[in-house]
Amino acid sequence: MASRGVNKVILVGNLGQDPEVRYMPNGGAVANITLATSESWRDKQTGEQKEKTEWHRVVLFGKLAEVAGEYLRKGSQVYIEGALQTRKWQDQSGQERYTTEVVVNVGGTMQMLGGRQGGGAPAGGGAAPQDGGAQGGWGQPQQPQGGNQFSGGQASRPAQPAPAAPQGGNEPPMDFDDDIPF
């Protein structure tokens, strides 16, 4: 079987600014985000710690774009799976320009990482997408790749906020005195 190649990009990084969401004439949402990924190393000659940050343009379509616009903010950590795509366009002076982006549509994935910014419920009384409505997935069996994941342009939102009654003993203890190793 002859392979035609593989075009798959996986990124884990932080948003450099709030998502920019637009709607196409057909009503479909498009979100543009800039994602920063960093690597650090120690210079062998000087022993100095060095760091390099790369900025990636990411374009999300459909439900993924709507979810990104509603729940992602500058600094949010996110896992992205998409395809690399270069497009040609003309600037205001008529000069041809090229832009390379990671495109996340039907076959791609976006997964929100880290906790909610600011803690507590989101402003406006809405419910953030959660695993079955349980906070952070506690009290529910874990999904294979974790929670808050949206794949293939399909994002499900709970119909109601999480129930107020505590769930059957699966919630972790709230011991905040432990030292966190990171």
Curated annotation (Swiss-Prot):
DNA-binding region(s) in UniProt: 55-61
Residue span of region Disordered: 113-182
UniProt keyword list: DNA damage, DNA recombination, DNA repair, DNA replication, DNA-binding
Gly residues: compositionally biased ranges: 115-139
InterPro entries: NA-bd_OB-fold (IPR012340), Primosome_PriB/ssb (IPR000424), ssDNA-bd (IPR011344)
Any Gene Ontology biological process: DNA replication
Stretches with biased composition (Low complexity): 140-159
Listed name of the protein: Single-stranded DNA-binding protein
Gene from which this protein is expressed: ssb
